[in-house]
Amino acid sequence: MHVTGLTLLILACIGLLATARVPGIGMESAVSRKRMPLQDLKNVHLQAASGASLSEGTSDVSSSIFNLAKVILGAGVLSLPSGIAAFSDSKNALLPATVLLVAMGIVSAYSFSSIGKACKIHSVGSFTTAWAASVGKGSAPFIATVITVKTFFACLACSIILGDSFSSIAKSTGLPKFMHDRSNMILLLSTCIITPLNLLKNKDLLKYTSMLGLGGVLYCAVFIAKRYMDGSYVEGGQFFQDIAVSHRPSFDTMKPGDKSPFAVFSLVAMIATAFVAHYSASRFWVDLKQRTTAKYNKVVTVAFSFSALMYGIIMYAGFLTFGGNSLGFILNNYSSNDVLATIA
């Protein structure tokens, strides 16, 4: 069953890539049906930071793909196996999980592309201004607030994860005690690294950190898949005895009624959050060098397809390794004696 599901995922990714060639992708038709009065539209354009004509972008297609893939892929990918475990410990649950992943990936890619198309139609350079021109100025402040709150919590989550990870690394490598404290590490990283990166005007420079981040995600995917295939965590495996009973593989122990049917929405929420990068859609359109709809759609489809594939590998391999005992941060399931897990 899980082989069929993985095949479905790969085919869907190929199909998603094919949408890059569809000229109508986006929201051009929807926008054209509900245009604002000419004077209001002019006012919106005057308020746009970029004016009626956007300046030339500086990021090429490959840089944009790397950057967007890194924006999409985050630490949330390591929670996906637990999303399946939330409603089932059966390997058959991988099929509906695959359907959810593919469907939500396609919807997310389409809506991301639509935001870029709206920016093109109205010659604007921000999500809020595109919304005002497409839907109406009255609700634009609400959208701006939602984006601000979402990105604030995204940055907060990023800082917390980095603080937890690097404080542990500091302890194990003998760095100064100041760095052993999670709060100190969060403050240090946020001040010295995260904030300067966010203030960069030329996002093309982020492609190097994006490559590093994507390399980390790719390593995690390869590691998790390797441990599933080599059987190190099955009963009798190399690391089986090292981990707590509550962390060991568990399959087909749940009885009907043990889990609410609504528990599947835990996975839905995780996948929906995993694909969220839409607050950056207008930025990617503005930053694209010699921007065209075809180039933008290529960036979107390649980045979302790659992300969906990484999500699928980690979700599949992680769940197939630990089943119903998959933890919210799947790396915590692995033995502290597993060197490859420590590197991850």
Enumerate the language-model features and the residues they cover.
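Extracellular loop-to-transmembrane helix junctions
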Residues: P81-V124
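Cleavable N-terminal signal peptides of Sec/SRP-targeted secreted and luminal proteins
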Residues: T4-A18
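Membrane-interfacial loop- and helix-cap regions that link adjacent transmembrane helices
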Residues: E56-G57, S62, S113, C119-A144, ...
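Membrane-interface "cap" regions at the ends of multi-pass membrane proteins
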Residues: L16, R21-S82, F87, A109
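Membrane-water interface regions at transmembrane-helix termini and the short interhelical loops
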Residues: G83-F87, T191-L212, D287
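Transmembrane alpha-helical segments of multi-pass small-molecule transport proteins
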Residues: L8, N67, V71, L101, ...
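Residue-level signature of the transmembrane alpha-helical core
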Residues: A69, T98, V102, T145-T148, ...
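Central hydrophobic cores of alpha-helical transmembrane segments in multi-pass inner-membrane proteins
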Residues: A75, G105-S114, S190-L199
